Amino acid sequence: ACDELLVLVRQCVELGFTEIVLDDVQFPNYGRVERMTFGEQEDTPQLRMDAILTFLDAVNTELDGTGVTLSISLPADLLETQTDETAGWDLSAIAQKVDRIYMDAADQAEADTARTALSALREDADGKVFYAAETAEPVTGGSYVIG
């Protein structure tokens, strides 16, 4: 599946896309997860997190030198938990692999809180660009997407 996604990324670059937004980059974290298997290796939280980061590295390799922004959409509750071992998410590690993170924000206060928290994860990134609020209403002080 990873190879097919990388082909799609290459095609998007060739078509002139300026940003790739990844959504649902995760292992299943709801339903009957105890019945799911992920290959012959012993399934561990670290194995899942490493798989997500390896995938992001592969996408970055495809995008290297293209100027295309790599973004990811993640749930806002990840700000509090920082990790979701079932899904394979480690927010701090993911933040080092992407140019922008999209998260839900109900209002301006939530957007500001998320921007501050996420900006702390990447000192080399402009917080107003690194975090993009997914909101029903426009927010000030940064990027947003109205959903």
PLM-predicted stretches and their roles:
Residues 33-34, 80-92:
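Distinct, well-ordered alpha-helical segments
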Residues 18-49:
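Active-site-proximal loop/short-helix segments
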Residues 92, 98-147:
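Substrate-binding cleft of secreted/luminal carbohydrate-active enzymes
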Residues 1-10:
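Active-site-adjacent "subsite" loops/lids of carbohydrate-active enzymes
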Residues 8, 52-59, 87-94, 113-121:
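A general structural detector for well-ordered alpha-helical segments in enzyme core domains, enriched
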Residues 1, 41-52, 87, 110-114:
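Residue-level preference for long, well-ordered alpha-helices that form the structural scaffold
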Residues 21-23, 46-86, 125-136:
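Aromatic-lined carbohydrate-recognition surfaces of secreted/lumenal glycan-active proteins
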